[in-house]
Amino acid sequence: MNQTENTISMEKLNHVRFRALPCSHDFCITCGLCSSACPASGIDGFDPRTLVRMAGLGLENEIINARWPWICTMCGKCEHLCPMDIRIPDLVRSIRGLREKNKIPGILQKGLEAALKTGNNLGLPKEDFIYIVEDVAGEIAEEPGFEDFKVPIDKKGANLLSTIHNKLVNTHTEDLKYWWKIFHAAKEDWTITSENWEGTSWGLFTGDDEAVKIMAGRIMEQMKRLEIKNLLWPE
C-alpha cells in the first residue's frame, strides 16, 4: 500500500492505553445514536462516535491533544442512548486526565490549583467568605417571616452540612437564599463550614482523580471536625 500524508503508522497506535479504560469503547457498532443525541455534536466538527472510534483504534496522541474531549459537556445523553452501553463520559474524562496539566484549556486547571491551595476555586480568604455569607443572611432577615434568620457557621453537632458552589459567593449570591430559606422553613438543623466549603470539584472535569480525592476528603474532615453525619452537596 502506498503511504500518503494521511497514512497512520501502526507504531502510532496505542491500543493498550485505551484498552485499560473501563469504558468498553471497542464495543461500538457505529450506529450514530450518540452523535444524534449530543448537544455539542458538530461544534468544531465534534462527533462522539468518532471520539469512541479513535480510542478504539488507539490514536493516543491525536485524541489527547484534540480539542474534542473539552467540547463535551459530559451530560451523559450519549451513554443513555447507546445500545452497547458504552460509557462515553467516562472515556472523555479519562482522556482529559491524560493531558499535561499546563495544557488544560480555559480556567479549569487554575481554579483547581486555587482550590487545592486555599480550599475553594476562587482563592477566597476565610474572612471574606464569612463576610459574604453573613451579608446574605442579613438580607434574608429583612424579609417577612425570616426576621430571626442567621447563617450557622461551623455549628458542631448539626444534623446537616451543606457545601457551597463557588459562584454562589461570587456572582449568584441570590441563589444561596433559596436553599437557606428552605432550611429555615423546614426547621432543619444545618450548618456551613468556614473552611474547605467548596462544593465544586473541578478535578471531575479535568480527569484529575487525585484532586477529586483531596477535595472530597476535605469535606469529610469538616464533617468529622463538626461531628456531622449528613451531607448536602448541592453541586
Regions found by a protein language model. Name each.
Residues 25, 42, 55-233:
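Iron-sulfur-cluster electron-transfer modules
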Residues 1-71:
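Ferredoxin-type iron-sulfur electron-transfer modules and their immediate structural context
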